[in-house]
Amino acid sequence: MSSAPAPGPAPASLTLWDEEDFQGRRCRLLSDCANVCERGGLPRVRSVKVENGVWVAFEYPDFQGQQFILEKGDYPRWSAWSGSSSHNSNQLLSFRPVLCANHNDSRVTLFEGDNFQGCKFDLVDDYPSLPSMGWASKDVGSLKVSSGAWVAYQYPGYRGYQYVLERDRHSGEFCTYGELGTQAHTGQLQSIRRVQH
């Protein structure tokens, strides 16, 4: 007598609307979308519902601009995804699922200098304030994601610009802060958390 294999995670999916509060035209995504205006026919995205998986949204087409982590749940307007970010975006134009968001096995190493040089700090848990946990600098020069997926923030308390860090992108290696995203103009990272799957 054989038992059925355990079901894997449901495929990533989210629904987008061109107006706040889940109104107007909508489009459902199951995979990467470099430009929702072209692929989904929406002029803009003003509300989002994540049904499965974890997604990263970008304010511009082709995965450019500010990044916003979208975990399972409802985002009825821009303030729901911008949160306490110092940069508010009232539109999202490209989306992709986050890879390897395994909350049970997450590990990242921060380095003071570029190319994995200088003092290092190994993390396996959420840190709302890196300085209060012993990280002496407000900047991170480089980092390696050994497992899982993380969101790093510019300021303590999970505020400011967001940077989604995945083991399966860049082989988990970010040699300089410029590799964190197109909006990364400084290496200032002061809080970090594991992606909630």
Swiss-Prot record:
GO terms for biological process: lens development in camera-type eye; visual perception. Keywords: Cataract, Disease variant, Eye lens protein, Repeat. The keyword Repeat applies. Residues 100-105 are annotated as: Connecting peptide. The keyword Repeat applies. It comes from the Eukaryota. Residues 1-11 are annotated as: N-terminal arm. GO terms for molecular function: identical protein binding; structural constituent of eye lens. Gene3D superfamilies: Crystallins. Residues 12-52, 53-99, 106-147, 148-196 form the Beta/gamma crystallin 'Greek key' domain. SMART domains: XTALbg. It is linked to Cataract 42: An opacification of the crystalline lens of the eye that frequently results in visual impairment or blindness. Opacities vary in morphology, are often confined to a portion of the lens, and may be static or progressive. In general, the more posteriorly located and dense an opacity, the greater the impact on visual function. Crystallins are the dominant structural components of the vertebrate eye lens. Homo/heterodimer, or complexes of higher-order. The structure of beta-crystallin oligomers seems to be stabilized through interactions between the N-terminal arms. Has a two-domain beta-structure, folded into four very similar Greek key motifs. Belongs to the beta/gamma-crystallin family. This is Beta-crystallin A2. It comes from Homo sapiens (Human). The gene is CRYBA2.
